[in-house]
Amino acid sequence: MLCAVVLFVATVGCTNGMKGKKESYLYQFEGYDYQYAITKDQQEKVFRMTPAKRTVEVLNGVGKYTILGEKDKPLYTTEKMKDYTVDESGKNPVVMVHYALSDNAGDVTAIYTLYKEYMDVEISLENYSGKDAASAYYVREFTKKYQKVEKRSVGTWKFPENDDFPYQTFDSLAWIHRFKDGGSMYTFYEGEEAQPKNYLEAYPEHAIPLTMSEDQKPQEKLHFALVFSSEKDIKAADNRALFAKKNLDTALSFNCTTKGTGSATLYTQKDLSFLMEVENLTDQKKDAEVSCQIYGYDGSTCLEKTEKFSVKKQGNAQKKISFKAPSYGIYYAILTMQSGKDTYKEVYPFAVLKKHTYQYTKSSPFGISGVHFGQYQPNEDTISILQELGAANVRVGLGIPEYAEKDTKLLKKNLASLKKSGIRINGQYLLLDDWSEPLDPKVYEQAIRSVLDDVGDLLDGCEAGNEPNLYATYYGYSKEDYMAYYYEVNYTGAYPAIKDAGLKYLGAGVYQGESIWLEGLDYYGIMDKQDVLVTHGYAFPYSPDLTKDPQVELSFESSLVRTRQFLDKTGDKAWYLNECGLPTTPEQTEGISSGVDLRTQADYMARELLLALSYGVDEIEVYSMFDQQNLYHTIMPEEYENNFGLFYQQDYSGRIFPKPSAAAYANITRLLESVEKCEEISAGSDTVRAFRCDLKKENEELLGLWSTKERLSNDSNKNIVRTPNLPWVNQWTEKETVTIPVEAKSAKVCDLMGNSYEVPVTDGQIEVETTGAPVFVKLEK
């Protein structure tokens, strides 16, 4: 039925919580935890249900277009309602409301589909004829103050049909408003325009920022879901809201109840307990069936279980699952919930690590770059994870845009915790606070002095800038001209500020150890001044050791060769490789900037660590901690910059899932934390790379080996299309056995996940089976 005006008399609570006051509405809809109404004077009102089951007004209308000019000068906003219609012909009422912008600059149409569980909101700006705008927002007017607001990126698991690895796609950007009485309001902003373009701290608490077109017109459409909860249990409320927004009748949650590493699904015991819970979001009894398959890294199906649930209206039911991991390493739980016509599927990766107490953190060369702190970062968990992984050094951004605060208070607090854990910290001051390139050395110097006055005592060293030789290419300068700028501004400004703070001066990381830039550092005398030479090495999607030809730019080992040759010529110096690694870009499988699959990221990372040690690198930092850039943290499966992480970005529910590379990294640091020297040795085969590592532990030695006999489909200049691969399926099909002479009484082969087996030492020799995934041999003399 389509009607222009519908009259209801409803009993609702007003904003002061009074019950029993009668008000007349032109239209009213009552959901489980909210009410939407249009008053007699054509004002929209939104009410929420409190945990005490009282109805209170929360929003004066759903929102207003607000368009601003330069210096945030107000230009136009949504004025009062012109008319509205209600369509009740379908399962859920649809309300269409028309507004005019002020000064008749355009029209706004709002379409609300009203479900019992939530409101689906579509807003359109039409016939815009106003002035050029600088910015625009969709502003909500709260009639009752909220206690706090949280912001989160929301992802949805996608399962490719070609048997490639599952991955998350961007679903929505969530604002969660918490109220003093325990209730919550959720805004799930969806669509391409919702993809965060800035750090979450910069987003307003009460408004949705809109994009601007090149001709300075505001975004014309936005879509979001509005969900309310009267549930005081925040975790349960958050989960119910997410599934309500998905328009599902039931909600699934799956978590490990065994103590792990903070919010990360990292465990140091094999006996694990999981809790599977199904919640009914409707007022009718619901049946659901949840299947759980857990796959091991070796391809085995370690658990296959289906649980049936019968859940009363608005209720929940739980089932416990016990799991004993047969080996160390990464596991993937695939969960599928079926309820009526609804199907929901997700992935729960977790890792079982060998328990270990690190003893050589002060001297271990292994670190992680791209460690961020901020209001919307898992700060405490980040530090716990670093400790569990055995990261002995980190690089942390110091510029205000990187942690999105007005001062260094939050940064200082977390750096202090990091330092207390024994982890060495190198700060990086990248750009000025407005994220612009410095042009005046004095301005740059003062900016660095300002931050080091606050946090310098917590650092071991400070790096100024990042990959200047690559910036030269981006900006279209010759390397010689940009080197002159680097000397006159970056070095001249940064060096005195860093040295006066009593810190090591780390020159800006040289991308790929480019020879012309290294020679420029020597020519300008910077090499003599800097305490540490910093380089970055990348080669994705190619294997790190595809070639060692120094003339090849996009080659990891070639970058090491170039740097080693330069240091041998100019005089050795401390050398940090504080960026290396590979992205697992799910939706970019072709081209020189494409990524690798999850297993290959771990395998190639292990190769990079051994290669770097063998060329004399003093500190090696894998990039990066999480799948996020330094300025904004969102899910972007098509962008390689957002997929370098050892871990996925923390999900909507607060969980931090590891990739295989996280488990591999933890195992490598456990084996090699006391490494003193690494050198390449012959394995008797042209297609096997082998390395001997001397350890501080008396009577112990470690070998690292892998085979290059098999090359993956994207490990060639001729064909760089990645072959689809599931993370529990070994991508290496060819094996190569080599015989190596050793001076040892026993030998134990360890895989990247931490599992080991004995091999006999016969006549001073051992036989080792190799593939493209490195293995380690622990020798006891």
Residue ranges and their predicted role:
Residues 217-236, 758-781:
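C-terminal beta-strand-rich structural cap/linker in extracellular carbohydrate-active enzymes
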Residues 270, 277-279, 284-286, 682-743:
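Carbohydrate-binding surface patches
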Residues 28-30, 168-253, 297:
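Beta-strand-rich recognition/accessory modules
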Residues 481-608, 615:
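Noncatalytic carbohydrate-binding groove/subsite architecture in carbohydrate-active enzymes
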Residues 20-28, 120-195:
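Polysaccharide-binding surfaces and accessory modules of carbohydrate-active proteins
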Residues 582-583, 588-665, 682-683:
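Aromatic/acidic polysaccharide-binding cleft in carbohydrate-active enzymes
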Residues 382-388, 392-450, 454-455, 478-507:
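Aromatic-lined substrate-binding rim segments of carbohydrate-active enzymes
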Residues 23-102:
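Acidic-aromatic substrate-binding/catalytic surfaces of carbohydrate-active enzymes
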